[in-house]
Design a protein with these regions (language model features):
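N-terminal glycine/threonine-rich, aromatic-flanked beta-hairpin/loop signature
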Residues: 24-64
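Beta-sheet ligand-binding and adhesion/scaffold domains
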Residues: 2-9, 13-19, 25, 34, ...
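Generic detector of contiguous secondary-structure segments
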Residues: 1-3, 48-54, 93
Length: 114
């Protein structure tokens, strides 16, 4: 059995508070947009009708903790795929989510309470 990895400062649930391509405020009434990173290099995110499950790899960007990921999921009834990254900037995450052959958006997220 391998050693347990140390907890990443990015691990856990984060509330997406802004996106460059979509208005987060319009989706908060349905569900608080989030991105969540798990210890097992997995995770998920949801904003509006988009839900994705991630395969994550910890890394660094400019000397700061970061995660790069590929993802697959759905946008309403359509299957979608993509990639993305995020890095820890102070007490927030900043990153990008890309849809293969489609849209992209920057995002900012704050750690969820509790």
């Amino acid at each position: 059995m391998g050693k347990r990895k140390p907890k990443s400062p990015i691990e856990g649930r984060w509330h997406i508070v802004s996106m460059t391509a979509w208005d987060v405020e319009e989706t908060v009434e349905e569900l608080q947009p989030f991105i969540e990173f798990e210890r097992n290099d997995g995770g998920q995110f949801q904003f509006g009708c988009v839900y994705g499950e991630m395969d994550c790899r910890p890394t660094e960007r400019d000397g700061k903790p970061a995660v790069e990921f590929s993802w697959e999921g759905h946008d309403e009834d359509e299957q979608v795929f993509g990639r993305g990254w995020t890095s820890l900037e102070g007490d927030q995450l900043e990153g990008m989510i890309f849809f293969h052959h489609g849209d992209e958006s920057g995002f900012v997220a704050e750690r969820a309470e509790g």
